[in-house]
Amino acid sequence: MPHPAMSPGNVAVITGGASGIGLAAATHYAGLGMKVCIADIGADRRPEAAAKLASVARGGAADVMTAAVDVSRFDDVAGLETAVQKRFGGTDILMNNAGIGPDSNSFGPLENWQRILAVNLWGVIHGTQAFAPHMIERGRSGLIINTGSKQGITTPPGNP
């Protein structure tokens, strides 16, 4: 049985939503009759992803929103939450999915690790802090999904 937040007319926001697992989830939500917002830093991917979602969404392009967001910046994520509220009236599902894995290893440049943590850890925290209060205020069933990767748990062979 699906979660009650996964209902027609409800709103799903997916960070890192213009490709991969994020786009697959957004496509699924649009197919359920939900309105979707994909937030992604990749400007080159958003238009094609939006067109794909509009072809699946019951309301077409009117049920699809895209936004350029760097989840490592709280102000970007808070601005996204405000924009979704203005466009769709609020959020029922937040999928904190944005993540990076630049070429690095345990002994790689400190800047790589700082960027990884800024996106993969702080991005989740920023999303939750920006969206959860209004989701709770709405008094409806809501859902926050935080995705991850086994790369964050294990070290791949050849990568010290």
At which residue positions do the language-model features occur?
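Active-site loop immediately N-terminal to the catalytic Tyr-X3-Lys motif
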Residues: 154-160
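Canonical Rossmann dinucleotide-binding motif of NAD(H)/NADP(H)-dependent dehydrogenases/reductases
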Residues: 3-37
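Residue(s) in the substrate-gating loop at a strand-loop-helix junction
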Residues: 149
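A glycine-rich helix->loop->beta "capping" turn
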Residues: 58-63, 83-94, 102, 140
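A short, exposed helix-loop element centered on a Lys and neighboring polar residues
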Residues: 128-129
